[in-house]
Structures are given as structure tokens and as C-alpha cells.
Amino acid sequence: MGKLDGTRTLENLMKAFAGESQARMRYTYFASIAKKEGYEQIAAIFQETADNEKEHAELFYKHIVKNVDELPVTIHVDADYPVELRSTLENLKASAAGENEEWTKLYPKFANIAEEEGFKDIANTFRQVAKVEERHEARYLKLAKNVEEGKVFKKDKKVLWKCRNCGYVLEAEEAPEKCPACQHARSYFELFVENY
């Protein structure tokens, strides 16, 4: 593999690193808002996604460190990054839009450029991360729909609900106002899922 110095791939890796780093922080802020609004599970999902973005940023950063001639290096990038901090619903929609841009436009473009410049492993990283971003978008859209339709804590049929605090599980159309076991608020309930 050739060195990255002077390539478009180097700039794209830095853009991706900066974008993922900023997304991580935005999602951390969004988690706090979701928690304040009574959406514990959505807060946890924002935080989990923030952790995913941290890992993506690290992947891109390691490609830079591994493939430049000298460290430290300063890399100039010309890019736009979103600023958003509103309600949980608006934050979910903005997050979905950002994830969509990454997996449909940015990362496929960056992968193609990396491949053209002879960096197949970097191209592969962009493509694999794009697959994750696609799942992030789908999850954010589904959560936004639940918030919009008032279905975060209420469903059309009986389902299993689990308290995120103590693990109590009950079957009902909607989560209770308080957990019968630990007395934590409704905001601590989520759908019970066993996927192991």
C-alpha cells in the first residue's frame, strides 16, 4: 500500500474522523435530552450509537496514523458539519438524516476514491462502516415514528415490557406509570426482547 500523504483519501479520512467525532458528541448531548424528556431507552440508544461513532472515528484515525510518513501531521479539511440540539423527536430525525448522508453519499464516495488511489483496505473500511450507518438511520427513523405516534410506551396489542432499572417484566398494551417492583417511572420501561 502506498502512503497517504498528498492524497484525497487522507483528506477524506480526516473528514470522516471529524464527522464521527462530532456525531459522537451530538449523540451524547441528545442522550441527555432524551433522558430529561423521559425516554430512558432512547437515551441509551443515543449513547450506544455515540460509542459506535467513537469506534468509527478510531478506525479512520488509525488508517491515518498507519499511512502517513511523519507524525505529528496537520491535515486541513474543508467540510460542513451539522449543529442540532432540540427535542428528542427533532434530534432523532436530524440524526437519521446525518446517518443517511454518510451511508448513501459520503462513505461510498470516499470508498471509491480510496480504491482509485490504491487503498483497498481503507475503501473496505468506508464500505463496512456505511453498513452500520444504514442500521443507525433505520433505528432512528423507527424511534422517531414511535415518539411521533405516542407508541414509545403504548402498543396496539399486549407486549412484554421490561423495567430497565430492576428487570421486572409484565405483559400489557402499555408500560405502567411506575414499576410495580422498584417504583421507577414509566420512562424506565422498554420492550422486552430476548435475542440470544
Predicted regions: what is each one?
Residues 1-196:
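Non-heme di-metal
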